Structures are given as C-alpha cells and as structure tokens.
Amino acid sequence: MAAVTKPLVLITGANQGLGFATAQQLASTGQYNLLVAARSQEKAEGAVKQLESSTNSSLTPIVIDLDQDESITAAAKFVEERFGSLDILINNAGINRSSDPNATLRESYRAVFETNVFGVAVMTATFLPLLRASKYHDRRIVNVTSGLGQIGIAYSPTSEYSAKIWELPIYRSSKSAINMISAVDAVSLEKENILVVLAAPGFCRTNFGGGQGVKSAEEGARPIVRAATEGSPKELFGKLVDDENTLVEFGW
C-alpha cells in the first residue's frame, strides 16, 4: 500500500473540461495527491501526462465509467488496495443528452439519469467506506450541479437560468435530483464529520456545452475547488458554491 502524505482527491470526468481544470488547479498547489478518473485508461493517462509538468503531486490515472457498477466497484477496490482510504471525492462527470440521436424520450431520460444521478449515487455509496476510513480532518464529497437544477428560478422571467431561456428538461431534472441527493446525504453524514457540498460552475466554454459559454473552464473550476478545499464544514453545511464563487443559502 502506497504511503499518502497529502490529502487524496478523486475527480470523475477529469480528462477534459471542468474536471481537468479542477485537477489542474488542485495539482498546481502541490498540496493534494490526485486520482484522475476517466471512462478509459487511455483518457485517464492522457490527462495525467498533461498535468505532470506542472506539479509535484502524485497523479494516478483510474478508470471509472459511471454507467457501470462493476467499473465503480473495481475503482474502489483499486483505491482501497493502493491507498487504503480516500479523503475528498469530487463527483464531476456528467452528460447533458443521450449520445444516440435516435433515442426515444424514455431512452434519453434514462441515459442522462444513468450517468448524472444513478452514477453519482453509486459512486458516493461505493466510496463512502473509503472516506470513513480516512484519518483526514476535513473529509468531503463535492457534487457538481448547475443553476439549471434550481426549481424556483426556472419560473423566473428574469433569471439567466429561466426555463423560458433554457428548457432542457432532462438535464435540468437530473441536476435537481442531485441537489436533493446531496441535501439528504449532507444531513445523514454530518454526524460522521463528512461534509457534502454542491458546486455550480455556471455556463462554461467546454465540450460539454459545445464550446459555448460565458466562462472559461478555469473560471468554472473555481467553485468546485472552493467546495472541495476551502472554508469550514460549519460554514459550508447546506450551502451551494455558485458560479460567482459565493455561498448560496438553503433553497437551491
């Protein structure tokens, strides 16, 4: 088992976009060891190679396909055997639509929820024993959500996240589900001193959004990094770190 002297952070979807930018920012501090997760070994190793030149942190590629329980279980077993525990889990990976242009409505909902909701729920449940095994004083689970998942502002005629501007019912509802899962997990795990916090990066220029967006991936990663590493559990409990990198109270 490898000796870990820095907090160990696992980031899903870390080979591109917000996940890669988050890994980059954490790696640049030299204060964290990273598990760089992607759907394939090739993608994970490619991301590690790009990150290696800018850090003295340990970078370990790991394969995680959120649509496959066996993949998640195998990844957890690898982390347990290699490191013994995990300190911070960042559930970043997600999709906004089915990859099948001919998918039915039911198939489209299922594809997005499979990754964005079921995958995140299974990741958290599977890696929770490793978080419980951690001796780190500030264990965290960060779930990446979206302002589009906030039900109240979907009605607003003035909000940039209004349903009048962005319909996207499948993606929006998947992020609403993540918000509720996060709230329930936060309350449940508070007594174990494991913080569950949400981060909403905003509309960023990544492949996820077709290269469109008002923020760079680097800007979008900042709320994720803050949620993962800054503030106290008391300060962050029940909060969301929004796309302006500020804390939002209950009600999202």
UniProtKB/Swiss-Prot annotation:
The active site is at 171 (proton acceptor), 171 (proton donor), 175 (lowers pka of active site tyr). Transmembrane segments: none annotated. NADP(+) binds at residues 18, 65, 92, 171, 175, 206. One of its GO terms (molecular function) is oxidoreductase activity. The keyword Oxidoreductase applies. Disruption phenotype: Does not affect the annullatin D biosynthesis pathway. The keyword Isomerase does not apply. It comes from the Eukaryota. InterPro entries: NAD(P)-bd_dom_sf, SDR_fam. It is an enzyme of class 1 (oxidoreductase). Its EC number is 1.1.1.-. Gene3D superfamilies: NAD(P)-binding Rossmann-like Domain. Keywords: NADP, Oxidoreductase. Highly reducing polyketide synthase; part of the gene cluster that mediates the biosynthesis of annullatin D, an alkylated aromatic polyketide with a fused dihydrobenzofuran lactone ring system that exhibits potent agonistic activities toward the cannabinoid receptors. AnuI does not seem to play a role within the pathway. Belongs to the short-chain dehydrogenases/reductases (SDR) family. This is Short-chain dehydrogenase anuI. It comes from Penicillium roqueforti (strain FM164). The lineage of its organism: Eukaryota, Fungi, Dikarya, Ascomycota, Pezizomycotina. The gene is anuI.
